[in-house]
Amino acid sequence: MKRLGIFFFYEKNGDVDDFITYYLADLNKNLTELVVVCNGKLSEQGRAAFSQFTDNIIVRENKGLDVWAYKTALDSYGWAKLSEFDEIVMTNSTLMGPVRPLKEMFDAMWENQDLDFWGLSIHHGAKSNPFKGKHLYNYLPVHIQSHFIVYRRRFVQNPALQAYWDNMPMIESYTDSVQRYEAVFTKQFEDKGFKWDVYVKTDDLKDFTDYPLLVCPTLLLREKKCPLFKRRSFMHELEAYLNDTAGEPVQELYDYLRDETGYPMDLIWKNMIRTMHPHDFTRNLALTRIIEPTVLDEATAQSIRQNRRIALAMHLYFMDMLDSSKAFAAKFPPETDIFISTSSADKKPQIETAFADLNVRSVTVTVVENQGRDVGAFLCDLAPQLRDYDYACFMHDKKAIQTRPGSVGASFGYVCNENVCKNAAHVLNVLCEFEKDPYLGILCPPYPTHGLYFMNMCSGGWGPNFENTKKLMKDLGEQEKELILRRYFYGQTQTET
């Protein structure tokens, strides 16, 4: 058995994540040769990663998307050389896994010698064509998905396939790639009399979804022995999921991978944190944690108190709220260092007197310029003092005097305080969340949803300053999404990346 693997890779910086090398390590066990085709850049780190598996690495101009990457690899061998292989596998870095050995799939498909080409999974097509552009059909045909497709020797030797690739036009866009290659390849060659199949059979899901690997990946992995899943499952726009589901596919997939497979979850987190906006994976995975007000893990809580550096940063402006602010701080472990900023020199001794008998390791009060409210104080004066700590919490006294009736603002503060620091056990449980999850960077309370704040929730957390913020970001040349954080939060100063 001689099997060639063609692996297509694109990443804007040319960096190769560990999930890719994990995939290639298993794939390579089933190959005689591997060629990697990179569109655009390949960093030194990326080249070293691929060099574990092959010396045949092609770096080409970022043109033609995946189609021309595959064409480049095929052209580099030539049809005579390609005809020496029993199978040619074309796959790419949009897949993650495997959760079971790929050998199972290769062995099972090799038993069917009637096939000319085969793949991992199928798209069941659509009665209309959702893609704009150069349609070959007025509907979307059933097709093998291009993330994993295999050609048999007799298919490679056939002039029809050779002419198809020799005459492939330049691909100008993703839509062009779908219309000219992925969505039509299977039908075009089926119509010519060639036989095909897929490893993951989903005919029973035709009425359920046209895209089983994205919409019900857990079912495919658990019940249909699918070895691979889509990276896109975690990065897909939630709005697109909500057209067909309640958003549960990605959450179910994550839970299944974590609880029922040996797949290293670090591989997912490292890639998501490096390449995705936190807003997206937080929303897609519904990363909301409910923290109990009674200690759940005494051993971990004690370890944190003994071995971790804990800080509480506070910005205190309202002296008539000193008692409640002190009560908040009193819920933190005695090993805590407290850093307080305030807006005037006359407030400093009041705060120092109020906090003098607090059972904590230290209290430091600093007078700061009265600009930027609590945010300016935190970013400019408090945050630099927290870098040597493992865990830190930030809060400020909250009155919201601009709201009417005053109960609206008071309840804002209640929501924040109750969720951040209900009692001493609650604080320890929050810190335990960080201790158990090295990738967790920030925990913050939910939006207040009462009174006028209800509309802020409906607008994604923004109030009247949304347009001002958009203008500021445009002036600064910022293009990325904003990460909206409440001004009460816990943070871990050193996280895994």
Where are the predicted features?
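ER/Golgi luminal nucleotide-sugar-dependent glycosyltransferases, focusing on the catalytic module
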Residues: 1-497
